[in-house]
Amino acid sequence: MEISSSSKKHFILVHGLCHGAWCWYRVVAALRAAGHRATALDMAASGAHPARVDEVGTFEEYSRPLLDAVAAAAAPGERLVLVGHSHGGLSVALAMERFPDKVAAAVFVAAAMPCVGKHMGVPTEEFMRRTAPEGLLMDCEMVAINNSQGSGVAINLGPTFLAQKYYQQSPAEDLALAKMLVRPGNQFMDDPVMKDESLLTNGNYGSVKKVYVIAKADSSSTEEMQRWMVAMSPGTDVEEIAGADHAVMNSKPRELCDILIKIANKYE
């Protein structure tokens, strides 16, 4: 899909739980080849970020790389397209609330998408409610951690879980890469930011155009779960990718890039 020079955007891509900027490598290359700026970030204690999971005490600290990147966007007239995958949708939501004027659109790719008037932990709570116990953790490991907020747990995604729930439609090379690079992740479900029903406002978060990309072959967050989140935020545009597993950027990178470029052309 071609783009005009006037519609080129800066995409900032945010990974999901336990992953890192590395998972966006196909999408970053395609967006840059199309003439866009594309930046994939490591959240704190993720990917190549130097912190350990027990050194990151709050969800805001975890999301700080994104918040700092959005705050620093200083090109004249530059507005960003924020793209969040899975748990990364919650970091994107926080950035939308803080910097709505800097965001042309936010794209939630098989992602947790909160809504105004409810706390940010609601999508995760609903996901757990809908998921049968035997399919929730499989061979994932729960790791005890202690940080500045006290004791808690992080999760390590197991190889069978990755193969059956996240990457079942993706190339074998991408599954192998994920097995080597995933790190323990913290969902921060007890963080005050996750429990504040007044955090997301109509004037900020609600004012930013949202697009939800439904992964129709997602074995983790089912299509029904994804549509439930869309229904909770009326006015959200919807795109669908047939055959996309949870790791949409690996199973259907070309289709995802086409959608992102279409969004860049549509929203100024």
UniProtKB/Swiss-Prot annotation:
Instruction: Tell me the GO BP annotations in alphabetical order.
Output: jasmonic acid metabolic process; salicylic acid metabolic process
GO MF term set: methyl indole-3-acetate esterase activity; methyl jasmonate esterase activity; methyl salicylate esterase activity
Its EC number(s): 3.1.-.-
> What intrachain disulfides are recorded?
none
Q: Where is the active site?
A: 86 (acyl-ester intermediate), 218 (charge relay system), 246 (charge relay system)
What triggers its expression?
Answer: By infection of leaves with certain strains of P.syringae pv syringae.
Keyword field: Hydrolase, Serine esterase
InterPro entries per the UniProt record, alphabetical: AB_hydrolase_1, AB_hydrolase_fold, MES/HNL
Instruction: Please name the top-level EC class of this enzyme.
Output: hydrolase
Where does the source fall among the domains of life? Eukaryota
The record, for Pfam families, names:
Abhydrolase_6
Return the similarity comment. Answer: Belongs to the AB hydrolase superfamily.
Function statement: Exhibits esterase activity towards naphthol AS-acetate in vitro.
What is the designated name of this protein? Esterase PIR7B
Which organism does this sequence originate in? Oryza sativa subsp. japonica
Upper lineage is: Eukaryota, Viridiplantae, Streptophyta, Embryophyta, Tracheophyta
Q: Which gene encodes it?
A: PIR7B
